Amino acid sequence: MAQLNFGGVIENVMTREEFPLEKAREILKDETIAVIGYGVQGPGQACNLRDNGFNVIVGQRPGKTYEKAVADGWVPGETLFGIEEACQKGTIVMCLLSDAAVMSVWPTIKPYLTSGKALYFSHGFAITWNDRTGVVPPKDIDVIMVAPKGSGTSLRTMFLEGRGLNSSYAVYQDATGKAFDKTIALGIGIGSGYLFETTFIREATSDLTGERGSLMGAIQGLLLAQYEVLRENGHTPSEAFNETVEELTQSLMPLFAKNGMDWMYANCSTTAQRGALDWMTPFHDAIKPVVQKLYASVKSGNEAQISIDSNSKPDYREKLNAELKALRESEMWQTAVTVRLSLIHISEPTRPY
């Protein structure tokens, strides 16, 4: 296993050079991999495993996702089954349902988790907060995780392009003594690039913090705050949007993703440079207490409980659609529609920052 230096901290990382696909195939040659759920992660992981030569079946209830599985080449009665039959046939049960669905389907899955099988997740939620989810696996099975750092669509797209999406991995329970090898083999099989060592609880807490923080929740809050202040001070919608969202997403993010923030600061105008360096600390000091509060809420299980409770309500979908409609119809994101239609994007920024 490779050890990489991340800013002075050494971490264990598994690469495809150390653990080639041929080795993964050998380890899993006698296994039947049952992918349960064909929604977000299911298609990418199942199709990549199949294309990499593993014995894969899919378990999915009738409906739109079942029809998608058929369209993707899974054959009813041969490689596509109901959830119960797939769990019975599978020696490795990959539970790729949504967190809410895992809770409702768990009583169906559990009876088929007989001694020596492996239960696989791509998110630590159900196990980390199993006092709330009720997902308590039998003691005589392996419980493992490979969590791709991106969507199932990205995993599949990158696989077809000959690239790998990085993933984290963890072993929660090793009943057979072979859980680690199975985990890494599956990580390679689904098309991972690097595999980073973690635990179920670390994956779950960092994932929920990221979603509520800089990946989605905080970024919308920050963008909206700046947009509102610009609008309140007489700037037009297009001007406020361009200086808040458009330059960030279309010009700057690809650059600092590739080169780092220090490169960005070194390669912008002196006015932008001085302002960014001066204001990053006040923003950090204002935001960090909010992130600390968020992390405490995640770690305590409060955020998990909120998710469980909201997803369990009969009118959840109706209320969610109303929230998304309000977001979509807000001035900032309606402005986005017009801006995107009217501007011609080019691959490199025309401004110096």
Listing of model-derived features with the role each one plays in the protein:
Residues 2-77:
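NAD(P)+-binding Rossmann beta1-loop-alpha1 motif at the extreme N-terminus of oxidoreductases
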Residues 61, 74-128, 137-151:
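Rossmann-like NAD(P)-binding element
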Residues 66, 86, 102, 237-241:
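Small-residue helix-packing motif on alpha-helices
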Residues 120-212:
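Rossmann-fold dinucleotide-binding core
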Residues 177-232, 238-256:
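Active-site-proximal catalytic alpha-helix in oxidoreductases
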Residues 224, 228, 232-233, 258-319:
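Interdomain hinge/lid region at the active-site interface
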Residues 344-353:
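Single conserved hydrophobic/aromatic residue that forms the stacking wall/gate
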